[in-house]
Amino acid sequence: MPNQHILLSSNLLPVGSNISTWWNFGSMLLTCLILQTSTGFFLAIHYTANINLAFSSVIHILRDVPYGWIMQNTHAIGASMFFICIYIHIARGLYYGLYLNKKVWLSGTALLIILMATAFFGYVLPWGQMSFWAATVITNLLTAIPYLGVTLTTWLWGGFSINDPTLTRFFALHFILPFLIISLSSIHIILLHNEGSNNPLGTNPDIDKIPFHPYHSYKDVLMVTIMITILFTIMSFTPNLFNDPENFSKANPLVTPQHIKPEWYFLFAYGILRSIPNKLGGTLALLMSVIILTTAPFTHTSNVRSMTFRPLTQALFWTLIVTFITITWTATKPVEPPFIFISQMASAIYFSFFIINPILGWTENKL
């Protein structure tokens, strides 16, 4: 039976025996994707993409639709879970040198960019105060592009300001992009299992492999269960944990919030954008904060793949993590001293990681 052979081969997928919990975040991301797509579908059934009705339709989902509050809160908190998992997933990749599998790393970076775009479009849909003003600020960055900027912005808005056509196209994009994420995820997973995963030691795992099921499949199930438990605990007790208080008010183009900021998972990029007192420079820095990840496979100089046995690089890596958190924190603060200086320093350290890392790798080879 050919089907039996496929089942057997997936059951006996050989995997390195020493891959740790950090390798479980891929399956957790897949769970998040399934959760977001399914809850998103039920929300789309009841949502109305019209500037006069969008805010009311979200309230209608929460109050009147049976289990609508579960769908809406799971979708909103699920997005935060998605980004927590993806940031840990990327950090694991940087730490253990997984970026040397170039195709997997580059397809993953493309996935991150599309995911960020999808989340941004989704944040605009409830048409609350922060939704509207975050959309205004971020889409306005397109005007920084020389020659084409104003035309591109007008085209994206569907007019000369953010209005009904903008909301309609953002809803269309938010609906279609997850299917692109699903397609790219499939490619990402195929490319990964074509070569096989790395392990914490960074050594050749061929000498010691075990079947994926039951050993690693149960570990996956455990981590997914923990994640879903955390998600439902937040949803049950503090459903508005990640929400901005401004977003409980309907969008008003005549009243600007005191402090415009996107969702927490974009704050690191937003902090880098704000730290540069130039529109074009800030926009480029914003883009580079994510695109710079693509340089990692091409700037690796160490003879050792993983950071497990490289204490100098480990110190640099943890500096990057602290810097990431610092930028996120400063982006929540108003644009005034000392936050401007802290943000600028942290942004400089963030980018310097990708410059110092290859130099440090080369130095470690000489030790």
Curated annotation (Swiss-Prot):
Binding residues for heme b b562: H75, H174
One Gene Ontology CC term in the entry: respiratory chain complex III
The UniProt record lists the keyword Transmembrane helix: yes
Residues that coordinate or bind heme b b566: H89, H188
The protein's required cofactors: heme b
Compartment(s): Mitochondrion inner membrane
Keywords: Electron transport, Heme, Iron, Membrane, Metal-binding, Mitochondrion, Mitochondrion inner membrane, Respiratory chain, Transmembrane, Transmembrane helix, Transport, Ubiquinone
One example GO MF annotation: ubiquinol-cytochrome-c reductase activity
Coiled coil: none
Binding site for a ubiquinone: H193
Pfam families, alphabetized: Cytochrom_B_C (PF00032), Cytochrome_B (PF00033)
GO biological process: mitochondrial electron transport, ubiquinol to cytochrome c
Family recorded in the similarity comment: Belongs to the cytochrome b family.
Subunit: The cytochrome bc1 complex contains 3 respiratory subunits (MT-CYB, CYC1 and UQCRFS1), 2 core proteins (UQCRC1 and UQCRC2) and probably 6 low-molecular weight proteins.
Protein name, as recorded: Cytochrome b
Originating organism: Austrelaps superbus (Lowland copperhead snake)
Gene that encodes the chain: MT-CYB
